[in-house]
Every structure is written in structure tokens, then in C-alpha cells.
Amino acid sequence: MTYISDQKKIRKKILELTHKSNSAHVASNLSIVDILLVIYKNFVKKKNKNEFILSKGHACLSYYVILNFFGYISDKKLKTFGKNNTELMSHISHKVPGVVFSTGSLGHGLPFSV
């Protein structure tokens, strides 16, 4: 698959889940798809334990979709976004496979990662 087709699939899934959950910051989520895709395709590897921290926690849906795309979370789990009693909350939760640190307010990620 090409990068363009991958990012289109990811954006489509973000829009579908935003609509179904009746929540999420659409612009914030769509604006970081390219960045997340490049980082996960080229730098983050499961075996090497390279880690990524998303400080922009309100853009969690794009992060969850990327984690799904790269096999960290299942389609079934992804569909629980925005539902009651789910790990996939509207801000990043460290309880989600592939997530290192819970974030919400802008700027939390930088001091934690240092």
C-alpha cells in the first residue's frame, strides 16, 4: 500500500468514528494523521520498544486509529471509542496497548518524555 492510500483510509476511519461517537475534535485529529503515519511507519517499532508520546491528547482518536492500523488494538476495540466504560476515552489513556502516557492538556508529553 502507498502512503497516500494509507492516510486516506486512516482519515476515513477517523471521520466514521467521530460521527458514530458524536464526539472528538475533528480538525485536531485530521491535522496529525500525516505526522503519526510517518512516525509509526519509520521510527516506532514494537520489537525495539521505541516509544511515542502524544502530547496533543485531545487528538486521541487519530492516535487510536494509527494504533489500530499498526496492530496494537483490534477493530472491535476501536469501535468502542466514545462509548461508556471503554478504555478509548476522549483523551489518551495509558491503559490502551501502545500508549505510554495518559495526556490531555497540551504540553504534558514533553516534560514526561525528557
What are these regions, as identified by a protein language model?
Residues 14, 20, 24, 29-114:
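Cofactor-binding active-site loop characterized by glycine-rich and histidine/acidic residues
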Residues 1-10:
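N-terminal hydrophobic or amphipathic helices/low-complexity stretches enriched
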